[in-house]
């Protein structure tokens, strides 16, 4: 069972990682191509392109300027410990045991605008380059054009290494668009999380992001290996709804918080 998640805008490079064990991203040569494009952008260009404040634009211009593929554990951090958004609150990587971290390294993959596809222990430098960014590059008008079939093929290789065909898509639409579902060799399962609000069940972004992270952690903790086992997910008040589910979209509901 392979799990796909999105990265996070919020980063933590202050706290030391819980382990020195690390790996290097598979697509650093591609990352360097993108960095070279980004290094030609002014802070004003970045502010417009990424729709961010001047301060954040300046910070990212500096990050692009300082980026080097020859980084190490001394100045970088493993992705699973560096990302600190809602999804990663749900994953709660700081409480993983060494055995759980090993399973996470095997089963979890993080889609990234800059790095392509990351394993949890892959070292990254601070960056911000969302997959939906319309960054013109030698391969096209945006990052979807840049990555092309590369990430789909990488996911297929990871699925083959797992030994089963299940792909659990817990990534956002923005990031999963970088993968071509029809070319995947595995069975794609996309869980849906809905909370009760104003008289109906609906997807609420903040809660859904955290739920995706909690499900990723649940799969690791419980060593889930089938869709039926996945349906038993009951963390933080969520429960499986047979009525609202579709064959490859199991739906989980939660009452008003």
From Swiss-Prot:
InterPro entries per record: YaaA (IPR005583)
GO cellular component: a single term: cytosol
Top-level lineage group: Bacteria
GO terms classed as biological process: response to hydroperoxide
Family named by the database record: Belongs to the UPF0246 family.
Protein name: UPF0246 protein Shewmr4_2963
Organism: Shewanella sp. (strain MR-4)
């Amino acid at each position: 069972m392979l799990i796909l998640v999105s990265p996070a805008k919020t980063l933590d490079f202050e706290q030391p990682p819980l382990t020195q064990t690390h790996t290097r991203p598979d697509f650093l040569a591609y990352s360097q191509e993108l960095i070279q494009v980004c290094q030609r952008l002014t802070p004003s260009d970045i502010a417009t392109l990424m729709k961010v404040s001047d301060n954040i634009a300046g910070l990212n211009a500096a990050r692009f300027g300082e980026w080097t593929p020859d980084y190490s554990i001394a100045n970088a951090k493993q992705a699973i410990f560096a990302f600190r958004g809602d999804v990663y609150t749900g994953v709660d990587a700081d409480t993983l045991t060494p055995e759980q971290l090993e399973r996470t390294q095997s089963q979890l993959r993080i889609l990234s605008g800059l790095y392509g596809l990351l394993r949890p222990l892959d070292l990254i430098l601070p960056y911000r380059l969302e997959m939906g960014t319309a960054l013109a590059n030698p391969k096209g008008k945006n990052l979807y054009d840049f990555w092309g079939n590369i990430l789909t093929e990488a996911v297929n290789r990871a699925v083959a290494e797992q030994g089963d065909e299940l792909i659990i898509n817990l990534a956002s639409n923005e990031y999963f668009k970088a993968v071509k579902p029809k070319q995947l060799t595995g069975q794609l399962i996309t869980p849906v999380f809905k909370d009760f609000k104003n008289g109906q069940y609906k997807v609420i972004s903040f809660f859904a992001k955290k739920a995706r992270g909690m499900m990723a952690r649940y799969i690791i903790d419980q060593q889930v290996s089938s869709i039926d086992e996945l349906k038993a997910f009951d963390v933080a008040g969520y429960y499986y709804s047979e009525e609202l589910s579709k064959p490859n979209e199991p739906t989980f509901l939660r009452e008003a918080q």
